[in-house]
Amino acid sequence: MMKINRLFTVIVLTGIIFGQYNPDNHVVTTSMYYMNSVEDGSWTEFFELAEEEFTKMNRADKYLVSLLVLGHRHSGSLNEVVQIAEWKSIADADKSTVGLADMRKKAWPNEEKRKAFNKKYGRYWESKHTDLAVRELVTSRVKRNNKSTTENTVVSVVEWYLKPMSEVEGGTVKEREALFDEFHKKVIMRNDKILSRREMRHYWTGSLGGGTTPYVIVTEFANIVDADAVGINSETIQKSWPDEEKRKAFFAKRNKYIDREHNLGHRDIALHTNWVKLAKR
């Protein structure tokens, strides 16, 4: 399960960071884990063990709100596995980490069986991990996939860029957030091809102030065809704004906040296979 760098605990305890910018938002950590090549192992055995691991530990961890476990597709190396974990606060994330040992005891109350499982499952993993990011999840614009499924899905990770407010003529944070909320409600929530979506902004990762501000969108699709579809929102947009003039006016207003000059507005970070049986939704 996810381990958070102990530095996070130090920061919380010393009071350097007191919380998210918006107390209604959540904290999301992104970490990378590395698989071992097991001579007498198999993918079948690995996934059987992993399903037991995550099913039991996700259930035991009351602080963990959601978890995506993302395998290789078109990003990185075959042995790299990314976990995107959500908590209500960084304090909850720390409690989750501190309590892992007790959770494992509850999940496998028989000590011998627990040790045997840990040994068998643990050989598939290297002992190291890399903490990639700690971000603020905009909870007012989250779309969750609550449907029961055993079929793996596809997850894209894309970084977008906001203009400094000083460069947006007549712009305000209130207006920007209202426009983003409207797009989420009318497009993202109505588009069945977008299974889930998370918008994450600066917390301890990325830039803030002095220029363009990046934010990250994590989107889940049923298949690679939908993930690759450039105009996946076109039909929903047409239905939500049937009047062409009103449609143009809305996007002209919204898009003035997006920095199109920086990497043409976005940068594709990753495309993963989402191992749905390991997720906590």
Where are these regions (language model features)?
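Sec-dependent N-terminal signal peptides
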Residues: 4-16
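Short S/T/G/P-rich N-terminal loop/turn motif that feeds into the first structured element of a domain
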Residues: 19-108, 112-241, 248-281
